[in-house]
Regions:
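Active-site core segments that coordinate phosphate-bearing ligands/cofactors
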Residues: 1-15, 30, 36-131
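Short linear loop/turn motifs
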Residues: 22-30
Length: 131
């Protein structure tokens, strides 16, 4: 994550070919434009730039203003996570957290997640612990 490129060591260990992987791009990079065919099918204007974009977690972070180093947020839906915005990866030796690329260039979102958060909240509601 420090070099913003695929790990050749991991790719070789998995016995894969680096040429199978796409170029690593920033979320704000223009990667193409709407073609005439896509414009006809979608109603979008031909030539409209297509931006690389980002994943749901880091886009949610932008939505709540978590864009500067040291800011954090908590997401609660079907799953739940707490994420922080940082410039360098935070490595948890026990692997309880992971680092995601932020949509803000050069930033990362180390986060910890619970995959059954929504179900847990629903169970508590059904047990009448919440009114």
């Amino acid at each position: 994550m420090n070099r913003w490129q695929w790990s050749e060591e991991i790719i070789e260990a998995a016995e894969l070919d680096l040429s199978l992987f796409p170029e690593v791009r920033s979320s704000i990079d223009v990667i193409g434009e709407i073609t005439n065919e896509a414009a006809r099918e979608t109603g979008l204007l031909a030539g409209t730039p297509v931006i690389c974009g980002g994943g749901d977690g880091s886009c949610a972070g932008v939505g709540v203003g978590c864009v500067a180093p040291g800011t954090a947020y908590n997401y609660l839906g079907s799953s739940s996570w707490v994420a922080l915005t940082v410039e360098k990866p935070i490595v948890d030796e026990q692997r309880r957290t992971m680092n995601w690329a932020h949509v803000v260039p050069g930033m990362l979102h180390p986060s910890g997640t619970m995959q059954a958060a929504g179900s847990s909240y629903n169970w508590m509601t059904l047990q009448h612990y919440f009114l």
